[in-house]
């Protein structure tokens, strides 16, 4: 199969070497565990964290005479994912045996798909940025294919000083291997691609995307070349299990290859591992070619066939996907592309935001969700589903600001109280005397007191006749009133009394 270069060399993506510029070329093979209660060819459970070898059927253990039976839900999930990737759905596909020996592969082969996968070419649009101007760059990344295959078991080498153990709980679990074209040109693009792919499968409900549990793993193919030149020899970095590590692995590997080539050496085609502690890759084995696995159609499984009506029925029930949702939020709620990009990263966050924004100013809601709520959740190590503040409570805080009942500063304090103690924001404001002071007489007295106490500042303000110093006086008045004074009223009174004009 010939590889087509679809990207024009971009100098901002180049890596500077001792002998000139280099371009990194990246392709990714992402293994995503299919969300299904049972395995690809058996009825054994896929539950994470079970006791070793407790989720193993006779099929998974490769007992003689046990035949695989396709799990239709795994087929549906693969088709849903293919539709979400704007990909060609193949109405006929074939399962093949990929032959190799390893202790955690009891059959002596893996059931996969080689020449006829269930999903063909597709594409993903990623956003890279923001740059120093706050702008994002959209880049289209091609999808080569998606195929279904079995996962292997797990070898454990730390349970006994002289023996290794095998846990077959993962053996036979359904995986979708999603193969990109070699269209990625930087570690930033690779991170954005993996983030976007994880977002899509989570929206679809076809994979939970939990990389720390092994539900999503990436094999990263990296090569370097002179800008616009022929593709270089690639090295595959296996089983990278975090988006951050993907970026680190690419940056190290690209530099390693450039150093070898600039010293007159050649790159060996090999499989490597990434060591996150040392931040470097190391050689694992020479890279296998397809013929090394002796693929042939599995004689125990008929070709997988379905009609277009099957595909159409699944497509009709797909949820709104992140790109469509982002565009809708920008157009209907008037928020920035940057804010929308953050909000749609997780479906649960987008749902929370839309509940808060319903009937309210979209920009104000976005500001509170992104800066205050997500900031607090991140600090506490919580997910949006674990938020102590409900959309209704956060919406009530925003309403109190809009009504003029509380100031922005008091709203921050109220947010902390609701976060820690719960309760109805409106009642809390009443019970704790947090209402904003709107009585002009009371505010004017506070302004007069601050002016009287700072004659030197008054002279400076009047001499300059500029509004810049007014902010200092406003701050002092807000401090004196415990943040309860209406900031707009304070600002107007300060400027009036100091004779400052806009």
Curated annotation (Swiss-Prot):
EC number(s) per UniProt?
6.3.5.-
One function term, GO molecular function aspect:
asparaginyl-tRNA synthase (glutamine-hydrolyzing) activity
Its recorded reaction(s) are:
L-glutamyl-tRNA(Gln) + L-glutamine + ATP + H2O = L-glutaminyl-tRNA(Gln) + L-glutamate + ADP + phosphate + H(+); L-aspartyl-tRNA(Asn) + L-glutamine + ATP + H2O = L-asparaginyl-tRNA(Asn) + L-glutamate + ADP + phosphate + 2 H(+)
Provide a GO biological process annotation. Answer: glutaminyl-tRNAGln biosynthesis via transamidation
Which parts pass through the membrane? none
Q: Name one Pfam family in it.
A: GatB_Yqey
PANTHER family, per database record: GLUTAMYL-TRNA GLN AMIDOTRANSFERASE SUBUNIT B MITOCHONDRIAL AND PROKARYOTIC PET112-RELATED, GLUTAMYL-TRNA(GLN) AMIDOTRANSFERASE SUBUNIT B, MITOCHONDRIAL
Q: Which family does it belong to?
A: Belongs to the GatB/GatE family. GatB subfamily.
Function text: Allows the formation of correctly charged Asn-tRNA(Asn) or Gln-tRNA(Gln) through the transamidation of misacylated Asp-tRNA(Asn) or Glu-tRNA(Gln) in organisms which lack either or both of asparaginyl-tRNA or glutaminyl-tRNA synthetases. The reaction takes place in the presence of glutamine and ATP through an activated phospho-Asp-tRNA(Asn) or phospho-Glu-tRNA(Gln).
| Oligomeric form and interacting partners | Heterotrimer of A, B and C subunits.
- What protein name applies here? Aspartyl/glutamyl-tRNA(Asn/Gln) amidotransferase subunit B
What species does this protein belong to? Brucella suis (strain ATCC 23445 / NCTC 10510)
């Amino acid at each position: 199969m010939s590889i087509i270069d679809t990207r024009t060399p971009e100098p901002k993506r180049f890596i500077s070497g001792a002998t000139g510029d280099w371009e990194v070329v990246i392709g990714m093979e992402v293994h995503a565990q299919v969300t299904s209660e049972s395995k690809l060819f058996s009825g054994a459970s896929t539950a994470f964290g079970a006791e070793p070898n407790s989720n193993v059927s006779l099929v998974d253990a490769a007992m003689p005479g046990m035949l695989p039976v396709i799990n239709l839900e795994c087929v549906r999930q693969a088709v849903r994912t293919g539709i979400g990737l704007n990909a060609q759905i193949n109405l006929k596909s074939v399962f093949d045996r990929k032959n190799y020996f390893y202790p955690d592969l009891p059959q002596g082969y893996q059931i996969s798909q080689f020449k006829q996968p269930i999903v063909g070419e597709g594409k993903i649009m990623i956003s890279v940025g923001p740059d120093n101007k706050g702008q994002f760059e959209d880049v289209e990344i091609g999808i080569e294919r998606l195929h279904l295959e079995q996962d292997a078991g797990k070898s454990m080498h730390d349970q006994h000083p002289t023996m290794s153990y095998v846990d077959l709980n993962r053996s036979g679990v359904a995986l979708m291997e999603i193969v990109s074209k070699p269209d990625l040109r930087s570690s930033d693009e690779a991170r954005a691609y993996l983030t976007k792919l994880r977002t899509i499968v989570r929206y679809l409900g076809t994979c939970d995307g939990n990389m720390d549990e092994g539900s999503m793993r990436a094999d990263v193919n990296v090569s370097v070349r002179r800008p616009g030149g022929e593709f270089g020899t690639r090295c595959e970095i296996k089983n990278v299990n975090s988006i951050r590590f993907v970026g680190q692995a690419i940056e190290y590997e690209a530099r390693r290859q450039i150093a070898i080539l600039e010293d007159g050496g050649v790159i060996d085609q090999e499989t490597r591992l990434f060591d996150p502690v040392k931040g470097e890759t190391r050689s694992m084995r020479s890279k296998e070619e397809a013929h090394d696995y002796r693929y042939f159609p599995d004689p125990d499984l008929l070709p997988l066939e379905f009609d277009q009506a099957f595909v159409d029925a699944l497509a009709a029930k797909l949820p709104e996907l992140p790109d469509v949702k982002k565009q809708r939020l920008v157009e209907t709620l008037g928020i920035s592309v940057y804010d929308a990009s953050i909000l749609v990263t997780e479906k649960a966050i987008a749902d929370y935001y839309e509940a808060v924004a319903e009937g309210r100013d979209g920009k104000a809601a976005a500001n509170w969700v992104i800066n205050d709520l997500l900031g607090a959740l991140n600090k506490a190590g919580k997910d949006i589903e674990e938020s102590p503040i409900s959309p209704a409570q956060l919406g009530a805080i925003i309403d109190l600001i809009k009504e003029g009942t509380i100031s922005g500063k008091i709203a921050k304090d109220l947010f902390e109280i609701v976060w820690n103690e719960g309760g109805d924001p409106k009642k809390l404001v009443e019970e704790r005397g947090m209402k904003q002071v709107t009585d002009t007489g009371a505010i004017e007295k506070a302004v007069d007191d601050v002016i009287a106490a700072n004659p030197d500042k008054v002279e400076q303000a009047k001499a300059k006749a500029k509004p810049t110093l007014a902010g200092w006086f406003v701050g002092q008045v807000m401090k004196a009133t415990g943040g309860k004074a209406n900031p707009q009223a304070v600002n107007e009174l300060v400027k009036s009394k100091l004779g400052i004009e806009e």
